[in-house]
């Protein structure tokens, strides 16, 4: 169900909005309307009455951008995880950018994979033709087919944090959020070096934490990308660079996962449900508990549940 938010503002702000969204204006304007604009995952409609309606998955984020400049803040907009100074510009969907995403963070078995992809604006129609979209709406076979083509089309940087290293870093006090931040930053830095002297118009990270927290996680890193970096939840729907990164990250994860299943000598389930507890218990019986760190993320509750099944 799409969100719908209305704010009350004034003619000056509405004129600023029209200017901001000038590349996204719709030829159609509803009765009593001043303009209608369509940006990724949000439609903005401004009315002569001073009301502005935001509709779509990113309605809260877009509304929050203008709520701060509106002179009538009494129509409060609910605080959104997308409400921050790192929100992408309205025109980002048509820009040449780097997008990054991660896969495997919610799976007990298997590694964490992070990929950064550079998509030139001219490549956007081709990516659409290849079927690039939110990887959650694609099965493993579709992911593989699209990924194999993407590998030859877009520059990318792919990182894999294997389970043993993941557990070692986690034991040293690095939570999953910090590990994700480190990998995203590394993948982005690697890719920017790879595509130099080409400079993207921006970097869009599929948001997994507040941007200020992300940069706190990177405080001790020598190289941190800060220039024109944007964060957005559901980044796949904001720019195809994130959708492409998501597909390549999942492709890498599936390949690693299959190798892990071969190593285990048994099929390993994805996710973190009950079937995972049962498989982990079988794996402990088969290979011994000392081998478990090679296959799983030990801090998940599934570890304790698996051992409980063996009692």
UniProtKB/Swiss-Prot annotation:
Database matches in InterPro entries: RNase_HII/HIII, RNase_HII/HIII_dom, RNase_HIII, RNase_HIII_N, RNaseH-like_sf, RNaseH_sf, TBP_dom_sf
Keywords per UniProt: Cytoplasm, Endonuclease, Hydrolase, Magnesium, Metal-binding, Nuclease
Domain RNase H type-2: 95-311
Gene: rnhC
GO molecular function, one term: RNA-DNA hybrid ribonuclease activity
Top-level taxon of the source organism: Bacteria
One Gene Ontology cellular component: cytoplasm
Protein EC: 3.1.26.4
Cofactor(s) in the UniProt record: Mn(2+); Mg(2+)
Function: Endonuclease that specifically degrades the RNA of RNA-DNA hybrids.
Species name: Bacillus thuringiensis subsp. konkukian (strain 97-27)
Protein name from the UniProt record: Ribonuclease HIII
Transmembrane regions: none
Subcellular location: Cytoplasm
Catalyses which reaction(s): Endonucleolytic cleavage to 5'-phosphomonoester
Catalytic class of the enzyme: hydrolase
Similarity field: Belongs to the RNase HII family. RnhC subfamily.
UniProt cofactor note: Manganese or magnesium. Binds 1 divalent metal ion per monomer in the absence of substrate. May bind a second metal ion after substrate binding.
NCBIfam families: rnhC
UniProt-annotated binding residues for a divalent metal cation: 101-102, 206
GO biological process, one term: DNA replication, removal of RNA primer
């Amino acid at each position: 169900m799409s969100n719908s938010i209305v704010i009350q503002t004034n003619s000056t702000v509405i004129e600023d909005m029209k200017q901001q969204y000038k590349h996204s204006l719709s030829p159609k304007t509803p009765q009593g309307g001043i303009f209608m604009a369509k940006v990724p995952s949000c439609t903005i409609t401004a009315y002569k009455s001073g009301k502005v309606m935001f509709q779509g998955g990113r309605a809260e984020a877009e509304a929050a951008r203008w709520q701060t400049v509106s002179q009538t803040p009494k129509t409060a907009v609910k605080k959104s995880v997308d409400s921050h100074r790192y929100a992408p510009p309205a025109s980002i969907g048509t820009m040449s950018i780097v997008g990054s995403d991660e896969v495997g963070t919610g799976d007990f078995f298997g590694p964490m994979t992070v990929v950064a992809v550079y998509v030139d604006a001219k490549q956007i129609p081709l990516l659409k033709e290849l079927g690039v979209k939110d990887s959650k709406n694609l099965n493993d076979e579709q992911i593989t087919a699209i990924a194999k083509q993407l590998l030859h089309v877009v520059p990318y940087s792919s990182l894999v944090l294997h389970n043993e290293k993941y557990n070692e870093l986690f034991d040293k006090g690095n939570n999953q959020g910090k590990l994700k931040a480190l990998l995203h930053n590394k993948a982005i830095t690697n890719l920017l070096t790879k595509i130099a002297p080409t400079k993207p118009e921006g970097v869009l990270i599929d948001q997994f934490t507040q941007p200020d927290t992300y940069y706190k996680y990177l405080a001790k890193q020598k190289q941190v990308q800060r220039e024109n970096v944007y964060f957005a939840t559901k980044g796949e729907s904001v720019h195809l660079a994130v959708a492409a990164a998501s597909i390549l990250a999942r492709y890498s994860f599936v390949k690693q996962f299959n190798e892990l299943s071969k190593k285990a000598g048994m099929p390993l389930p994805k996710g973190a449900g009950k079937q995972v507890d049962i498989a982990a218990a079988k794996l402990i019986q088969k290979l011994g508990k000392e081998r478990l760190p090679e296959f799983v993320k030990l801090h998940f509750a599934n570890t304790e549940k698996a051992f409980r099944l063996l009692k």
